[in-house]
Amino acid sequence: MAEKKAVTSHEPVVGLELELEEFSGTYTNPGYGAFTFCSPSGSSSYCQDVISDFTAVDSVQSSAPHSLQLLAAWPRIWASHIRAVHQSGNKFLVQWTSLFPEGYGRDITPFETAEIGTSDATAEFVVEDGKVVGFGLVGLVGQLTERERTHATVKDRVDVWFDKA
């Protein structure tokens, strides 16, 4: 498995439209299922477990992101967690990652990995009437799609749409 790279951005950072906590919550998609994003201030037992896992891994990595983040557990065959790092506006860089907060085997050093060939995607959140209604993912195919090029609304141009529950 490949080690995750440091998250960097070359675009000027523009703040979020709402507080980060407003972007936390459960999101659903009929094909991908549901997951819950936690902000660093998430207080539920689920969020405390997720934050603890990421904190353990990030504490031993020099390349850990220092930007605003949303974090989620997402146990699948190719990943155990999702890390969404704020880029600009309502856009986040989404990384599917596998966390080993207690190490593996005899080595108890926490670490994070990602499958070779998986690409990061961009999540663009949509806010209507002061509330987050969902987000769309683009970049899953690794190149600009016809939908991205020709459609105006986020929901129409993304590869996958998640509704906020």
Task: Tell where the protein language model's regions lie, with residue ranges.
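Peripheral terminal and inter-domain segments
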Residues: 1-165
